[in-house]
Structures are given as structure tokens and as C-alpha cells.
Amino acid sequence: MRKNEKRNGKALLPIVVFVVLYLGLGILFEYGLDIEMGFYKIPVVVIFLVALLVACIQNRELKLNDKLEVMGIGISDPNIITMIIIFMLSGIFVGIVGRTSANSVAYFILSLVPPQFAVVVLFVVSCFVSLAMGTSVGTITLIVPIGVAVARVSGFALPVCIGSVMSGAMFGDNLSFISDTTIAACNGQGCEMKDKFKENFFIALPAAIASIVILLVLSVKNYNGGFIEEKYDLIQTVPYILVLIGGIIGFNVFFVLITGILSGSVIMIATGMIAPTDLIGNMGTGAAGMFETSMVAILVAAICALIKEYGGFSALLYWIKKVFKGKKGGLLGMGLLVGLMDIATANNTVAIVMANPIAKEMSKDYGISARKAASILDTFSCIFKGILPYGAQMLVAVSAAASLGEVVSAFDILPMLLYPYMLLLSSLVFISTMKVTDGRQ
């Protein structure tokens, strides 16, 4: 198949179409037509399908069969397959344990700490779990149901609880040694993981501390004392405890989720909470709840494969390299580069992989060390991916909440994503105060 290596900014049109339709319809529904939860009413799969059709119509020099082959290669990426399997397993897990188990976990956690600090606990627990598991999506899958239950019983707004979970998940995703983003950034830039971790740590730690302080202030100001202590069944907390321990230890996310599924099934049947036939039905219902999320991942992969084939990403990379000058400018350029890739691909690992070659070339041109380049790529991919309304993290969080009977919009959660915003501020301070020397930094 013929490769199109030329730079073609018009190839980015599908992304523009998606953003215009998604935001435009959302604003129209929410504010123009005054539809409750207007953004949540938007069929995101249909919007992505329209964007895919636009991508297919472009570049008439390429035959349809060749375009289908390009899309097939993009969809078959191991990261996409892994993501979809995680989606399915997480849906099955939620379908099995349901609301009752999540509520028991929430009451148990709140019995250990003052209820006004429950949101801070959600953030810290998510940090540790994500750091150990190396996956923000897996962490969100495990902790969001607990956050939903905490919101129900503590009086805190649901977006605050979910935002705290997502923030903590992005902390670990950025720093974990076993995170796909860490592996991709270090391998692409040619540095040791421990060196990248040291660079990252001094950017991430101030952001995490600032997030905790803000959450503490919000907790004290907004807690209304509405928590009513209720009884909880410790046996129902076992599936969540097992997956939490597995995550903290650092077991593979597949193993952790399968453990939760098996333990939840045994406990639900043994305690008479559900009949075996109903359990199987709940598994199917839970998996079905993740179908839309999985379809989004597939469509995004197909769209991005075509954009890359047409030369859209090459044009984007060329523009960034041309605009930013100097070492500090080079670091900012790297950050914007991977951020734009994140916006375009909705996959931070893919964004880093795509940005790696040009970032490595920029490192040579600007005299930037491999460990610093890897740190910036991973950090900014975390920032942008953490706040994407159509990213996997947000989609999983919203889907998990919906599967538990709670309707929440991505735009309700966005203002509560404190850590990505603090991480952006910390990164900008780090770059602006960096001492510039003639050596390689």
C-alpha cells in the first residue's frame, strides 16, 4: 500500500468535525434547548462515526479497500485490544457486585475516617492503586463505584467524588514504573525508568500536595453533615478489598479484575444475594454497559490511523517544531505536541509513541536530556488525557456511574479534576524556572 508521507493539515478535518459537532450539540442541548444533562444526551458513537466517514471521504487517491486496511491495522493495535478487554472485564465486575457491595465498601471506608475527609481518602487510595497497577483506566474501573457510593452516603456531590478518583488515577498513571506511558516514553527517548521517575517526581509531588490541600478545604467548606451511618456487610466488601490489595501490590490488571469477578460471583451466590442464572444475566448486562465505550475506542483508532496515513500528524509535528525555539520552548513544544496528539487520538500511550520520533529529534536540536524529554512527554500526556471529555478515563468513569444508576456528565466532572490542573501549573513552573546551560539537560 502506498504511504503518504507529505504533510497535510487538511487530514486533521475529522478531528475538527468531531469537536465542532460534540461541543456544538452539547451547548445547544444544554443551554439552547435547556435539556437536562444535555451533554450526556449526545450519541458520542454517532459523532465519531460521522468523523470517520469524513476521514474516509478524504484522500480520493487512496482506494476504499486500502483505507479499510489502514483502519484495520489501527484497530488491531495491542493497546486498543487491551483497553477493550479491560472495558469488558470491568463491566462484568460491576455487573456482578452491583450497588450493594459498593455501598458496603463506602460505609466501611467512612467508618474508618471522619466522613468530611472521605473525598481526600478517595484521591489518596486512587493514587496508590494506580501507581501500583500502572493503569488509570483500571484504577477508575475499580474505585469509581466506591466513589459513587461515597457520594450517596456522605453528602458530597457526585462529580467531586468521581473527580477525586480520576485525579488520583492520573497521578499513578504518570509515575508508575509499569505504566504503558512510562514504558513508551522511556523506550522512545532512550532513558532509564528510574531517571525518568526522579524527573517526574519533583513535578508530580507538588501537584498532588496542592490537590490534597484544595480537597481538604473543599471538604471542610462543603460537608453538610448529611452522612447517616448505616450497617454494612463486610463479606460484601471482599471483592473490592481483593482488587484494591491486588492493585496496591501491583498485580496485572487482568488478574485483578478476574479475581474480583470470581470472588464476587462466589460471595453473591453463597450468601444467597443472587441466583446463578441471574448472575450470568448480570454479567451480560455489565459487559453491555461498556459496549459504547469499546466502540469509541475502536472508532478513534480507525480515525487516527487514517489521519496518520494522510499526513495529518506529520503536518502537526512540523508546525510545533517550527514554532517553538530554545530549550524551554523545546520542552513546551514537546508538551504541546503530545497534548495535541492526545486530543487527536484520545490515547496517551499512542500519543507518546507518535510523538517520540519528533521529540527525540527536538531533544538533539535543543540539547535536552532523554530523561527530561521522557518526563515532559509522560507528564503532558497525563494532563491532556486526564481532562479529555471523550477520553477513555472519562468515558469509563461516566459509564461506571451510569451502570450504578447515577447519571453524570463529563462536563460536570471536568471542573473537579484538580490534579491535572495542578500538574499543568507545576509543569509550567518547573519549565520556566529551569536553569538553562550549554550542556545537555
Identify the role of each PLM range.
Residues 124-136, 167-173, 245-251, 303-305, ...:
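Transmembrane alpha-helix interface/packing and boundary motifs in multi-pass membrane proteins
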Residues 1-26, 58, 62, 66, ...:
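Long, contiguous bundles of hydrophobic transmembrane helices that form the permeation core
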Residues 41-49, 56-58, 67-101, 116, ...:
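Core transmembrane alpha-helical segments of multi-pass membrane transporters/permeases
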